[in-house]
A protein has these predicted regions:
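Acidic (Asp/Glu)-rich catalytic clusters
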Residues: 1, 53-62, 85-93, 136-138, ...
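An N-terminally biased module of ancient metal coordination in phosphate/nucleic-acid-related enzymes
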Residues: 1-63
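Hydrophobic faces of well-ordered beta-strands that scaffold small-molecule active sites
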Residues: 6-12, 40-42, 66-69, 95-99, ...
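Active-site beta-loop-alpha junctions enriched in small/polar residues
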Residues: 13-15, 45, 68-74, 100-104, ...
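Extended substrate/RNA-proximal surfaces in nucleic-acid metabolism proteins
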Residues: 61-64, 72-173
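Catalytic pocket-lining loop regions of alpha/beta-barrel enzymes
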Residues: 136, 141-212, 229
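Short acidic/histidine-rich active-site segments
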Residues: 225-242
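Mid-to-C-terminal alpha-helical segments outside catalytic/metal-binding sites
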Residues: 245-278
């Protein structure tokens, strides 16, 4: 299908996972391959996915496939050994290191169980030493840094510290998601510091979403499409599959005034640059 040709989805959930998913990784890869999608990053909040990426690539060599590791509790937080292992999995499919997401202090303190434990990133307005050590490791290994579900203030601190360490590729993951909720000004600051900002279908397509396609388009207009990336965050068992998410997201961007050139930049060119494919 022409609308999918060349897209790279940097944020796709699929089974196996502890959370119910609409497709498994092979079903997702087949669906994307058949539609002409160029590549996918497999994202899991509980486990590293470099090994899955290896298996998917073996079955679907036409696809660019990468894995990620999220520094949540189940990984051990700022666990350098886990990240090193992730990069050593056969053929080097490990690409993105995410700061805590579901285990982030910022998300936990806004959730239903506010007394739950979390993986801290900062204290007293400063990044923790173990976080700075992790950034050193990411820089040394040439990996992509995602700011996870950190607070807006922490996100800016992470980007500044990453740039000081010459981390080349930085992703602000779903900044308009309810648990992060960056302002447009904060997103523009992140972009000006050299990060990419990710806009996911899930935040506008999930039941009860308070963010709209119009909100996305307005933010992208302020930030500039050159620093923005579109992705699905698809795979929730209670929502339509990834391809539907993409169809809706692309249509929503066009309906709100973004050009085909800008949409291609955000769904093809920018993700390729983030992943070192261009």
């Amino acid at each position: 299908m022409q609308i999918f040709e060349g897209i790279i989805d940097i944020h796709a959930h699929a089974s196996p996972d502890k959370t119910p998913r609409s497709l498994d990784v092979l079903e997702l890869a087949r669906a994307y391959r058949d539609r002409g999608v160029r590549g996918v990053v497999l994202m899991n909040h509980s486990d590293q996915t470099a090994g899955l990426a290896y298996l998917v690539k073996k079955q679907f060599p036409e696809l660019e496939v990468f894995g990620g590791i999220v520094l949540n509790h189940l990984i051990g937080g700022m666990n350098q050994h886990a990240v090193e292992h992730f990069t050593r999995i056969e053929e080097g499919f490990g690409k993105i290191v995410y700061m805590p997401t579901t285990s982030s202090e910022h998300e936990v303190r806004q959730g239903e169980n506010r007394s739950a434990s979390f993986v801290p990133v900062s204290h007293g307005g400063k990044l923790l030493p173990e976080v700075l050590d992790m950034l050193d490791l990411i820089a040394g290994l040439g990996l992509v840094l995602s700011t996870g579900h950190s607070s807006p203030v922490e996100i800016i601190m992470l980007i500044e510290a990453a740039r000081a360490r010459d981390i080349q590729q930085i992703l602000v993951t779903n900044p308009m998601y309810w648990a992060i909720a960056m302002t447009t000004g904060q997103m523009k600051e992140a972009a000006d510091l050299g990060a990419y900002l990710e806009f996911i279908y899930y935040s506008v397509g999930r039941p009860g979403a308070i963010v709209t396609m119009q909100d996305y388009a307005a933010a992208i207009d302020t930030i500039g499409p050159g620093r923005c990336i579109l992705s699905s965050c698809g795979g929730q068992a209670w929502l339509p599959v990834h391809a539907y998410a993409w169809s809706e997201l692309l249509a929503g961007m066009r309906e709100n005034g973004l050009s085909d050139e800008d949409i291609d930049r955000m769904s093809k060119t920018n993700p390729a640059r983030l992943l070192g494919l261009e």
